[in-house]
């Protein structure tokens, strides 16, 4: 597709510099939000949900991905238009974001050139629009140019760009509205949308992936693309969590061990090497105490069952959080970080939700995505403005 965004150009540029519409009135961001319930790091922006159920975002906003009815970049949280309560989750993608309400409805905003907002148009929106024909949903994940959700009945549905089969409907036809992933019509537990691939956990706990497989990111011990789900090698049951990234994927198995596969140029698989792998390899030194693992583009992080965060891979902007800018092929401890309950990985930054429900971020901050009311990158955690 000639007009598709060039990811290498996006990477190079940053490394140099780094249907239905809501009609509720915009709410001002809380001056001093006390607590959050979740946080999601996107490529150049971040969003959270407060304990009041309000959605707020910060960082780059050229396409309206902050959702505040503007295209003004912000280095501190701004309120998403109309979503001031009753939201339980949020997902930040490349240049768009999506939220899930307590009633199971999905709203998306931002870049929409390929229909990734799901409102049956290709019109960008700086405020939330409802996803068309989706029904009730239990989870949503915004990827690069596509989005996926799991319905309350466990069907996996995706929409947006499909040039590499990342929608999983056994075609490469893009869709402005949700389509059902081939064979995943009920019982699915989770979905993770990435750059040009997607992964899900089935009712039986198997990890299945689809889309581009040029670096083995589908994990089926091949490098063959697939327009429909294939089973990840060795992960046929009891998979607890999965995270699809740029060209790599990670998961937590039934023994609470972190496994990763795919592209490994910066050590983002965490196996103390830079060797790509088309099937899962264990993350060096983590053992069986992993609660969740997240990967994005060039680095990955894990949250242990004791609430500690460890990261590995690319670290030029301090995104590993170990108070250095040295890359690491194996996990390093995040510097001076409170006990955490969630970790989320963006392009060149990382964020956590602490046990005290504060949001802290670190890494590249050229667009204000760290949220501390500055554009200064940091190699150790800082509180998001207002916490």
Short names for language-model regions:
Residues 2-31:
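Secretory targeting and sorting signals
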Residues 78-80, 129-130, 179-181, 230-232, ...:
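A short beta-strand motif characteristic of beta-propeller blades
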Residues 58-76, 109-127, 160-177, 210-228, ...:
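Short glycine/serine- and acidic-residue-enriched loop/turn motifs that recur at repeat junctions
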Residues 30-62, 71, 75-78, 94, ...:
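An edge-strand/N-cap motif at the start of beta-rich repeat modules
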Residues 45-48, 57, 96-99, 108, ...:
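Conserved core positions of repeat-based scaffolds
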